[in-house]
Amino acid sequence: MNKFLMAGITAGVMAAVSSVATASPLVTANVPLDSRYYSYIDKLEGMGYIKDIPTGTRPYSRLDMAKWIMEAQQVAADKPMPGYLKTYYNEMRADLAEEIAYLQGDSKDYGSNIKLRAVEARLAYSDMQQDSYRYRKGINASWQPLNRNNNGYRYGDGINIIGKAEIAGSLNKDLALSLTPRFSYDKDQHGDASIEEGYVKTHLGVWGIELGKQAVQWGKAPFAMSNNATPQTMLKLNLLEPHTFDNGFLKFLGKANVNVFY
């Protein structure tokens, strides 16, 4: 029953956006939820340099980020950015140079740009002993102080050594992929190697199709889904371009990005 209901809702949503232009946008990898770019974009939006961000659905793609950086550039022509905000802008513009060049028409052929995007090495210490905390009675809980936005990984007691790398990019205009291997060591689990995130992304017309494992933030706040939880393996459909619902029973949504996942 639930599957039929989901299929019916999906069909209704697809029908509601059937008027979307048939041109196929560029497919790019997503920006991981733990990227500092999200705080940069939020700050640019809060300061009035970006006005076109649909709320509630993350991660955003690299192409989305590039569009918003171009929007911020246009606004900054009449409203100069403060120094700290200019630093954020310059960092993102340099990283998204290929996507921006494509949007500006400077690069008609978007070739393979899969590369090592980020490397992280982290040393963490966690005190897992309940006796270290001043409670009169013990409580039935597992202690994970200050462990947040960690894709569901738990710290071991004592010293934790963690390393990971993000490899991502587009193979061509129609196919992108991302892979994030992770290694950690602590005295509880000793060595642990895993794939933190990994997915392929393509499209069917204006619908993006993603298959794999990645962290998702859903809704106005990360209550139900966020990178506090373990990334789930899923099939996700979404509009590569946000759509404005001008009429029909979904008119109340206004501008939104439709997402369906299983």
Predicted regions: what they are:
Residues 168-261:
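Outer membrane beta-barrel
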Residues 4, 14-16, 20-53, 64, ...:
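N-terminal propeptides
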Residues 30, 34-37, 58, 62, ...:
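Solvent-exposed, acidic/flexible segments
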Residues 30, 54-56, 76-87, 104-117, ...:
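Short loop/turn motifs that connect adjacent beta-strands in outer-membrane beta-barrel proteins
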Residues 1-9:
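Bacterial N-terminal signal peptides that target proteins for export
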Residues 33, 93-179, 256-260:
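Transmembrane beta-strand segments of Gram-negative outer membrane beta-barrel proteins
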Residues 24, 49-51, 146-150, 220-222:
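Glycine- and acidic
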Residues 55, 150-156, 186-189, 224-226:
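Outer-membrane beta-barrel domain signature
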